[in-house]
Amino acid sequence: MSKIIGIDLGTTNSCVAVMEGGEPKVIPNPEGNRTTPSVVAFKNEERQVGEVAKRQAITNPNTIMSVKRHMGTDYKVEVEGKDYTPQEISAIILQNLKASAEAYLGETVTKAVITVPAYFNDAERQATKDAGRIAGLEVERIINEPTAAALAYGLEKQDEEQKILVYDLGGGTFDVSILELADGTFEVISTAGDNRLGGDDFDQVIIDHLVAEFKKENNIDLSQDKMALQRLKDAAEKAKKDLSGVTQTQISLPFISAGAAGPLHLELTLTRAKFEELSAGLVERTLEPTRRALKDAGFAPSELDKVILVGGSTRIPAVQEAIKRETGKEPYKGVNPDEVVALGAAVQGGVLTGDVEGVLLLDVTPLSLGIETMGGVFTKLIERNTTIPTSKSQVFSTAADNQPAVDIHVLQGERPMSADNKTLGRFQLTDLPPAPRGIPQIEVTFDIDANGIVNVRAKDLGTSKEQAITIQSSSGLSDEEVERMVQEAEANADADQKRKEEVELRNEADQLVFQTDKVVKDLEGKVDAAEVAKATEAKEALQAAIEKNELEEIRAKKDALQEIVQQLTVKLYEQAQAAAGQAEGAEGAQDAGAKKDNVVDAEFEEVKEDK
């Protein structure tokens, strides 16, 4: 069976891993890095992904970051006259990770396990699945990030019974899950989180502080200057990372703006204490879901065996201190917070292919599911933290006499009134026979699959008429839209490959021109002038083709010049060897002569000893 890769599709960084020899291994990208920034840039119809896209974000307004925060919404971003959905941008990142995996494994990759925040709702999960399809991947399973982290952590510790808390603070989302590990079973007991809290918010408090300080000093609002804002974002991210290791850092941004007197510079020292003061509210926001998860699980903090930190933002000292204070446990440092989720996704891929045996994963639904009933009340059918996959049915009736149809309004959330919860979808069960209210028996069944994706059906028990829906929110994509995006993504991948080959061809041609000049110079006066003229002529023909940008002509002229240069290079080596041989011969003769010249005539006198 072909390999199933594990992908952590993160808000700020993404990572891909695979099972090899019974161990999950992170796959480096072409630059040799183990994580790839979740950044996509467009420049003259060319798409750039990762570090190269992030580096030019300051000067390129067509750079898209943190798109994960918009998954499952109807958000669109316009780039070069075309609208892109979050699914399409995520698919570009996934294509890049897929290509890294294929280069590493030396085979085509078509299947993946992709992780999502535990607190992602149905629409966000469906959007992630669609992104995988657009990227040319069969998404075998969607699993929750804290659960994946627990899988990677617990793979070697299946014999130990443990209660663990996974605290996952990523770039854009926060999750906390409580799990029990025993005999290869990873059972999620409870989960809680905040999908609008992460490292980006910690960056933002630094940015706001810098903007306020600069405005106080110069009366200029940098938040209105797009390019200055991007520089501030880069500086804030760097300062945040620095302050995990040192107690203060210098932020220096020369020529950030201009005033009446000339250019203005931003120079500021940020201490760890000031950063902790600025971000105290954010750290506190992570503790409420932590307490809720513990309460839902019915555990006291003292019952926990391990606290595992996941996500780059957990490197912030104030975050580590807060979770230590809350649980009374020193956080476990034996996993890499940037990689552990992808490693866990790879383990789940191994479970699905049969490469990993004896592991059973029992996850939960993060939010309650139900329908709207009379008076706008939210009636729950499946409570949050129910183990999935699961199915639950309940019988409802009509609210009016001779009602011909019922509207089924499907919701997800924890509030008592429907209006305060998230609508997942609506559908109708029609052609009900006339009857007094309260008489028809309508059975509503909710199914949640292992990916956390919801199916709902309604059945009139009197007539056996049934209506079903796979939840597709207003932001969801139809099969036709996904198919169109798949084709566009494939076409773009081909175009990107073609552009890469064109760039490589031009680089090779330029290199050959330089090499020709060097060889001709080295052979000056040593070979027939006609041969040198032939090489020069072929070189000039290639230069003309490069200037015209005629790719086929460049290829033909390059091949012709390559042959001539190879012949000249052979002659260059032959001459060098001949010269070396002559030099050795001359040296040998010289040594012999030297020995002859150095012969000293000495007088010999025999001395006889008297006996």
From Swiss-Prot:
- Kindly give the InterPro entries that the UniProt entry links to this protein: ATPase_NBD (IPR043129), Chaperone_DnaK (IPR012725), Heat_shock_70_CS (IPR018181), HSP70_C_sf (IPR029048), HSP70_peptide-bd_sf (IPR029047), Hsp_70_fam (IPR013126)
For this protein, the record's Gene3D superfamilies field holds: 1.20.1270.10, 3.30.420.40, Actin, Chain A, domain 4 (3.90.640.10), Substrate Binding Domain Of DNAk, Chain A, domain 1 (2.60.34.10)
Induction per UniProt is:
By stress conditions e.g. heat shock.
Keywords linked to the UniProt accession: ATP-binding, Chaperone, Nucleotide-binding, Phosphoprotein, Stress response
User: Which stretches does UniProt call biased (Low complexity)?
Assistant: 577-592
List modified residues, type Phosphothreonine: 173
**What does the record give as the function of this protein?**
Acts as a chaperone.
Know the name of this protein? Chaperone protein DnaK
Origin organism is Bacillus anthracis
